[in-house]
Amino acid sequence: MLNRLRALLSPLAHEQSLTLSGDAQSSLQRYMGYEPADVDMLRTHASVPARLSGDHCIDGFGVKTLYECVPFASPDSLDLARLQHPIPDDGFHAEGIEYVALLDSIERFSTEGSFVAVEAGAGWGPWLAMAGVVCRSRGVERIGLIGLEASRERFALMRRHLDFNLLDQQHGVAVDLFEGAVWSHDGVIHFPESALEDMGAAASTDSIDIDYRGHPVTTREVPCTRLPSLVGEGRKVDFLHIDVQGAEVEVISSHLTWLNQN
């Protein structure tokens, strides 16, 4: 594993990235992070023809996304080739390594018939939905999806997105959604009010009027939790995606023991 990481971070990584992606340019991909075998693995999973419908799109993994759930992306800007095979990225929100990481986790850890995914700073819950849809297509019997989102509006989009993909208790999926933020303690922190299409809002320990981007903001108190409190002590997590806009150091450093145990 260490040798693989060295290879992925080597000076040749950028050149290899262009080769693997057919010289496609990407504003989302910061570093490649994957190898040719990972691209092959991704393609084996992307067996559903990507297409655009009246109110939603379907990607190569079978995930259906309502346009209303991604208000920052215009349907006219979506690239079917990237929706089919998101290398070097999917063209609108995530780079290839994120897809590879989730698929690799599913292949490694769902073999005993269960899979638990956690998405913190989930937005509309794209990785929860993909985990659920892919696991269901593989016949995984016990699927657990745990999502955290501090924005009221985006929390509603996450629930809508999961329901639209039939990922709910009624369809045999254990879903636990927390309207709040992941943090270093259980309690409350501050989160800015922001436009629905602004995916860059970040929580803070104190009330602020200027955010990390220099934007004026008005914050409100929201619940916060440590992951062990929400997930449960001793419960196995197979995939964890954290996107908390710069608070990753605060969150991860306070969860090291729990992360190492998982």
Predicted ranges, named:
Residues 2-262:
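Phosphate/nucleotide-binding beta-alpha loop and adjacent structural elements of enzyme active sites
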